Curated annotation (Swiss-Prot):
GO terms for molecular function: serine-type endopeptidase inhibitor activity. Belongs to the serpin family. This is Serpin A3-5. Keywords: Cytoplasmic vesicle, Glycoprotein, Protease inhibitor, Secreted, Serine protease inhibitor, Signal.
Length: 411
């Protein structure tokens, strides 16, 4: 029976686009207390929990490599998919996204993402941020009107008729769409599409912001970055003198420096002590992030050395999500809320991400080095060994990018 089921792809870009949605509830769902709408903190907490869980899986599967992804893009795409899920398939997706279904209703989760999209799309002259979803649908496939409407209203999804029988043309159509929405940062989200594909869901996010205090390119010089005990590479190292939030975590053996964008969003650089990366990764939790944010205090850093980098990644997440408990969508899925029949199964979950950090700021579509030197009141921070980075939006506390930079010289 499984061999007869129809291919369905879930694509996760590293960008997002314009959202203008109005309040809408799924039919036949009564919210007992309308005031119990999911607030941004509740949504951010679940999304952060999911972000760190997914990070740990990706880091485990990609040892000694750069890791970069957009947890918000992945979670939003899966929440979008859950609109059409029923029964145990629905429960598995939402619990896999770290929602406690004894405390929160499905309707509230969708409302939470709806309001998050609205918040992310507020116009700003200090930040380029676009967020969106899209469906590419086999031309003769009949989707339920309710799914189409919920997708449009709650997730601002566009829909495009597509001829998947010409799989190469369909692949080009989708890849070009994502490339356009991500300002060229994600050039080839799909390497391959099966002719049996009938539906592709895409989520994309684009983020570009300038540092509040910019690095001077004239001071950027080649310097050593210690990838491991046995490997050192030369990278462009930026330097800056500034006052910025800083915290030395003696308990976890790491140092944190937060750099703020002109939009007041921020990038948090987490620098483990030598030999402490794996220990630190194991202890990444929402509670740890909250403690760090509460502990950051403005400090004068006379010399901050930070490598320029441009990292792109592409992940197939089927096995990773299965290990995180989201299994049924790939095997015996009940996605009857999409077409009215239970003949759809997700064949591939693909996520592409790109993040650039330079003297101007950040752009993303997705050994011996972290030394602190003190001479009286003079603080010098050298980021010249593997480190973690989290890009966080201030108003929603959403982690839009999370990753590990092991080798800045590798794209």
């Amino acid at each position: 029976m499984r061999a007869e089921r129809t291919s369905f792809l879930l694509a996760l870009g590293l960008l997002m686009a314009g959202i203008r949605s109005v309040h809408c509830l799924p039919e036949n769902v009564v919210v007992k207390d309308q005031r119990r709408r999911v607030d941004s903190h509740t949504l951010a907490s679940s999304n952060t929990d999911f972000a760190f869980s997914l990070y740990k899986q990706l880091a485990l599967k990609n040892p000694n490599k750069n890791v970069m992804f957009s947890p918000l893009s992945v979670s939003m795409a899966l929440a979008f998919l859950s609109l059409g899920a029923r029964g145990p398939t629905l429960t598995e997706i939402l619990e896999g996204l770290k929602f406690n279904l004894t405390e929160i209703q499905e309707t509230q989760i969708h409302q939470g993402f709806q309001h998050l999209l609205q918040a992310l799309n507020r116009p700003s002259n200090q930040l380029q941020l676009s967020v969106g979803n899209a469906m590419f649908v086999q031309e003769e496939l009949k989707l339920l009107d309710k799914f189409i409407e919920d997708a449009r209203v709650l997730y601002s999804s566009e829909a495009f008729p597509t001829n998947f029988r010409d799989s190469e043309a369909a692949r080009s159509l989708i890849n070009d769409y994502v490339k356009n929405k991500t300002q060229g940062k994600i050039e080839e989200l799909f390497k391959y599409l099966s002719p049996r594909t009938v539906l592709v869901l895409v989520n994309y996010i684009y983020f570009k912001a300038q540092w509040k205090t910019r690095f001077d390119p004239k001071h950027t010089e080649q310097a050593e970055f210690h990838v491991s005990k046995n490997k050192t590479v030369e990278v462009p190292m930026m330097t800056l003198d500034l006052e910025t939030p800083y915290f030395r975590d003696k308990e976890l053996g790491c140092m944190l420096v937060e750099l703020t964008y002109s939009s007041n969003d921020s990038a948090l650089f987490i620098l483990p002590d030598e030999g402490k990366m794996q220990d630190l990764e194991a202890k990444l939790t929402p509670e740890t992030l909250t403690r760090w944010r509460n502990s950051l205090q403005p400090r004068r850093i006379h010399e901050l050395y930070l490598p320029k980098f441009s990292i792109k990644s592409n992940y197939e997440l089927n096995d990773t999500l299965s290990q995180m408990g989201i299994k049924k969508i790939f095997t015996d899925a009940d996605l009857s809320g999409i077409t009215g029949t239970a003949d759809l199964v997700v064949s591939q979950v693909v996520h592409g991400a790109a993040l650039d950090v330079d003297e101007e700021g950040t752009e993303g579509a997705a050994a011996t080095g972290i030394g602190i030197e003190r001479t009286f009141l003079r603080i010098i921070v050298r980021v010249n060994r593997p480190f973690l980075i989290a890009v966080v939006l201030k108003d929603t506390q959403s982690i839009i990018f999370l990753g590990k930079v092991t080798n800045p010289s590798e794209a």
